[in-house]
Regions:
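Glycine-rich beta-alpha junction loops
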Residues: 42, 126, 155-158, 201
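Active-site/pore-lining binding-face segments in mid-to-C-terminal subdomains
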Residues: 139-195
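N-terminal beta1-alpha1-beta2 submodule of the flavodoxin-like/Rossmannoid cofactor-binding fold
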Residues: 1-110, 170-226
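A short secondary-structure junction signal
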Residues: 92, 130-135, 163-164
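Short, glycine-/small-residue-rich phosphate/pyrophosphate-handling segment
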Residues: 110-154
């Protein structure tokens, strides 16, 4: 199982990053792990130029950065997002990164390979924001067509991995253990969740009926012919 990991901070004692490393250690047959730190590995902020929406994603100012990330995701069966809560929501660099993939939502031109991949969102917080932060990312995962997305959250009261209370760390590790089991269980016979199936069927019907943007309808029709 190859993995692509996204992190929002370079801090080595980051609770979300260390949690991700622990999760990976609990998975069997792990192959290549691609790591990207945001914003360093994707510094270009979406400008709303509409190039990608219009089918010209190679004209995006951040395309050179996205190419490398896209290759890693294509080669991975699992994506992991380390998303600490910042001001009750996902870090801006993660939101900015996901904005570049609006054209990959099923309403436009999804990468259908996502229907055969899984994702994990790990969020920690000093207090609030543990519902809002993973939702910021899970919305994209569901509309990308990600087969299964798991959310792991833990309040840590501002503690980092090296000074987190044993109570919080024990709770977090237990959740990660359970998530690792779920990932491997579903990987054997991976099927999309009911929500993703429903979204896929709805957009498939709309695109095949030619009711969406022409560039998107053509993409669906041509891709499904293959």
């Amino acid at each position: 199982m190859n993995i692509t990991l996204f992190r929002a901070t370079k801090r080595p004692n980051s609770s979300t990053y260390q949690a991700a490393k622990y999760l990976i250690s609990k998975l069997s047959d792990v192959g290549t792990v691609y790591e990207f730190t945001l914003p360093e590995d994707m510094p270009h902020i979406c400008l709303g130029c509409y190039a990608c929406i219009n089918g010209k994603e190679d004209k995006c100012g951040g395309y050179a950065y996205l190419e490398k990330i896209n290759r890693a995701m294509d080669d991975s069966e699992l994506l992991i997002f380390c998303a600490p809560v910042w001001c009750f929501h996902a870090p801006g660099q993660i939101k900015s990164f996901l904005d570049h993939y609006g054209y990959r939502w099923m309403v436009h031109r999804p990468n259908f390979a996502m229907l055969h991949k899984q994702a994990v969102i790990i969020s920690t917080a000093g207090g609030g924001g543990l519902k809002e932060t993973p939702k910021d990312i899970k919305d994209s995962m569901d509309y990308w067509g990600m087969a299964r997305t798991y959310v792991v959250t833990q309040a840590v009261w501002g503690g980092f991995w090296n000074n987190m209370s044993e109570k919080f760390k024990t709770s977090l590790l237990h959740k990660l253990d359970k998530t690792a089991v779920r990932i491997e269980k579903h990987a054997k016979h991976l099927t999309p969740s009911l929500k993703v199936k429903a979204l896929y069927k709805m957009f498939e019907r709309l695109h095949l009926q030619g009711k969406m943007l022409p560039v998107d309808d053509s993409y669906w029709k041509e891709t499904l012919k293959k």
